[in-house]
């Protein structure tokens, strides 16, 4: 994950830690998709980091919901532990310098 974050330097990014079994996670996914579609051509990146689920379940959910942003698997919850995530969903915004600009716990909303 750190290598991946390093590769994002120069781009604004949303890193969202989530799970398919989490109702607030499921509720915010359409808003995240909307933001991704609106800003991806401007270099905005979304990384949905799934916590402790298998690839088949995540792929099925992403396809069912027509989510097109990248999803990464954190099967052992190492990313969640590294960023001290205690509740899902948790979202982190990185600025173009690669610095954490904002952390949101609970739900993202489009404003």
Feature names for model-found ranges:
Residues 1-13, 36-39:
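A short beta-strand-turn-helix
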Residues 3, 8, 17-21, 61, ...:
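Conserved hydrophobic/aromatic "anchor" residues
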Residues 6, 23, 33, 52, ...:
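Nucleotide phosphate-binding site architecture
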Residues 9, 17-34:
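Conserved redox-active cysteine motifs that mediate thiol-disulfide chemistry
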Residues 9-11, 41, 67-68, 85:
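Active-site acidic short loop of glycosyltransferases
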Residues 14-15, 46, 91:
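Hydrophobic beta-strand anchors of alpha/beta hydrolase catalytic cores
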Residues 26-65, 75-82:
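Structural microenvironment flanking redox-active thiols in thiol-disulfide oxidoreductases
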Residues 60-68, 73-111:
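Thiol/disulfide oxidoreductase modules built on the thioredoxin-like
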């Amino acid at each position: 994950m750190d290598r991946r974050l390093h590769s994002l330097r120069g781009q604004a990014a949303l890193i969202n830690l989530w799970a398919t079994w989490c109702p607030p996670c499921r509720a915010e996914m359409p808003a995240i998709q909307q933001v991704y579609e609106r800003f991806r051509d401007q270099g905005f990146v979304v990384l949905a980091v799934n916590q402790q689920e298998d690839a088949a379940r995540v792929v099925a959910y992403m396809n069912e919901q027509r989510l097109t942003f990248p999803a990464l698997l954190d099967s052992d919850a190492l990313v969640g532990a590294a960023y001290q995530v205690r509740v899902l969903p948790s979202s982190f915004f990185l600025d173009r310098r690669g610095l954490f600009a904002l952390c949101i716990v609970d739900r993202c909303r489009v404003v």
